């Protein structure tokens, strides 16, 4: 077994663009669930919408900044549409509506009726929309190696997307760090605990929940852009499973913490890569086909999610005394 | 010491008593200086009138007790007045402003702050965070201002000072950094009341402040409620235990089956046949208030225990 | 929502850990036994999988067929594929087909090694080699290299005539996993079509009701939104498939065994997982997230053993009968009759029997029910068993109705079940029945106006709209706040 190759690949997952995208999506979900107690089961919908908004605007010839703004606007409108009917209702309604809404985005996006806009189920190819992002890079084209990690500087799965991705993740963490310590974050924490109590103190709970939903959703849409930049916009790869992975990441790292989502994402992808690569090397393909190894990985994720939420709902970084898994 | 009536307290109580002297002891009686006036407030649950109040006024600066047997609709009436439930019909004004159909948060901002029967201390926040949350006019509660600490730090400092004063008054200052969930039931009641006071309300509405509180702390709570009145605040509180009420309230409103059946000063209400009927008729087993329980000797004993407990 | 706060002083209790470990072990053992008992199926694909790639939720395929200008397959041509997964190669087989399995979605650059194509053949569009295709997991993307004389006008016509990537399956997709029902193709609003779609909607709604009534009962008695209920439905279909196709039983005994085993999993789940969690005081939201993890684990276990493709419970073509303008298969008529009888039985159980009334009492007020001498845990056990059994029956009948079942057939319906339950009022069993019929009709009739592949979305839009105007559902009633 080639441990060097396996460990190098696993280490590559630590700072892969996908890891950054999932970390960012989990930061958004953390604002919903960790800070406010909102059960958003449709974070992948925000991501897909952001990805579509960015890609379609870019293909239409819009500059980079405008395409990003379109993604943000799409997520904002989506959050408002979801929040208006549900934020006054019980928490499980929001869960059902967000998961349904994310599914609607995916079903509409993959529908043949919109082929010209969204490319239907085959989606939008990356090189249709990644030029503006790659052109924004200050570096020269080519490849560059750091130790065993060699990637293109600007193209597709590049150093450039890694740098931008992790800078955005860092900024999002800084934002959460500021907000958690602010009076605004205190109101959210109160809402997570008992929204009636906060209402009785004169705070407009509905408005705060809406602000949290929009903010977390916008961060989710940026994560969507990050996620699709090194690949394609594929509606079926951004479905319910993606949301559940983000939840696992958040609960693994620790909800309501600043760095929990980042740590969770790194561990999630590294462990998954380790398990799959090792199995691929150890288990003969006559016993387990390669797709069965993939499926085995996801089975582990499902079981890990169950065990985590039962035995360590505060995750790695969380404080059990402070975390209430409450629905609003 | 809140349980010892101070001269100011006696004055305040006497002044309120004087103001209410000529008010007739009938349901819906008009008050000389009402802060809250409610008309035709009704709330149905599955065809049953949970609340059916024709008219009621609450005197400014007085402690008014809303009493009645279990299921009389007191809490529902409270929920309606504070915007936590919507009536089928009715309107009410608070300090001249109409508050019918206004959302709970805006009712609170209008100066009418409530507490809950089942204490809603925010258990996973510290006592100080609970207190700060009660404050108003904190610019940092705006999402964008929150990002610039310089904008909200000065106000935060003022809020913290105000909170520390209140905590000292409610003898919670030593618990400042403890999680609210670690406090005793009575301390949580005190915290909830102190937190409500952070907003400097005109009127405070307490839903069964004495429920589930041990006798020693009951005395201290009663003292705090009287002190609020002495500071000029209007207090409306729900209670179904009458002997708690008679020692501190200036005026008593009796509800049963959603209606107001009697009003008056405590002593007069206790002897009102409608009240006795309401209690005995509906709930024969309800303790009408065995005053032996709260005679002076017992009170003295409780007070001593209270002292020793500290 | 019932109290869903974590117990701050709660410490991990080893018995629960052991119990869960035991449960997982049990589950794993049973599926392993299943695997051992069915070597033909489980290992069948391996033999043929040397070249052909099967797309599933974790795998994407890049495929193509190479033919000479004369239409003969090109054998032994070598293709290089470079992308997120690194460098891969493929060789075309005797039919000219080649495929590459990727587990990392994204863009891949496919290069045809022109040195390996037969002499005298050339690429029709040399500018298109290498070409880039985007592939997602669960989809196949085609990279076609037409051979022949270079097209006139250079590369002007390289797009349009042949899509560079045309996915064939989308197993993660709800709509794609379920074949189109008879009569729903075609267009235009005609009376006959409306009649056909209405009947389809009623059938689909009735079958959906079998699944959603169980979901609603479980929610009603325990407060739990069970995201793994879809997998209970898939389980029924898959067990029936195992019975008919792998064990060789006739359909009816196989279906009965599937339902019985389905119900048994409900009993086991409550005994081994949910009851210990309730006793431990695990909050409702936590339990809901447990169901999400369970749903993920079970669905991939299905995929692990049975693959991502459709599984046909019966292989013979069903016979159809025509009633006026409406065509319906005899199997569907029987299914409808069975579903109606079973739903009637459930209604009788809830309204007419002591146990059923006790169940409703628990749903209404568990504390009061317990005080009246009803065993709350006993009732919850009955509800889990009943709900899982109903879901399994729904899975069998839905599998028959759509012609095939799959690892995802229940998962695709989960949101429609939630929509039905929410429409009917969360926790109201009869509401779930009414809600299912509405959802069935909405799904089928909406294809009169919107593309068929968006019809599931229409049901979900209805769900959101209903919440906007009547959050307590069609049959639910407003409850006292606070």
Language model feature labels by segment:
Chain B
Residues 1-42, 284-310:
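ABC-family P-loop ATPase nucleotide-binding domain
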Residues 67-69:
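The feature captures the beta-strand-to-loop junction immediately N-terminal to the Walker
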Residues 82:
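Helix-to-loop junction immediately C-terminal to a conserved catalytic motif
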Residues 143-175, 223-226:
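Conserved ABC ATPase "signature" region
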Residues 204-208:
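Catalytic Walker B motif of ABC-type/P-loop ATPase nucleotide-binding domains
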Residues 245-247:
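A short, surface-exposed alpha-helical micro-motif characterized by mixed small hydrophobic
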